Amino acid sequence: MTTSLISRTGRVQSWLDNPESRLPVSCTVFVVEDSMEGPNGIEASWRFASHALRNGAGCAIHLSKLRPKGTETRKGDDVLVASGPVSFGRIYSVLNEVLRRGGTYRNGAIVLHYDLNLPDALEFIQTPRSELPWVKRCINITD
């Protein structure tokens, strides 16, 4: 006798019946590295979020590895200044808005995560909802 390791209810059954529709998962986490490029970089997280949202899944985007706002780094002769996690939060918000309004409504969501013990936590918390209307925010608290 064989048993199915997948519970055939809700989203999973819907996907098994029609694998062209929504993904059978509700939410996955993408930990963003402090780099624009690379498989776990900022740009890769945009592709990840876009794919999840277009297929009806949600995603959690963990922004705690990004450099704090105002941090200076050198690239050759140039001095680059980090814009911080909230600035990237605006991009995820717009991405979600555009994908939800463009064509068929999908039931995906984006939750931005940020660690409480980091320098930009207060800005992350206090940014008005009107500036990040299409994402939810979560502060990670540790002992």
Q: What annotation goes with each model-predicted range?
A:
Residues M1-D143:
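Extended catalytic cores of very large enzyme megasubunits
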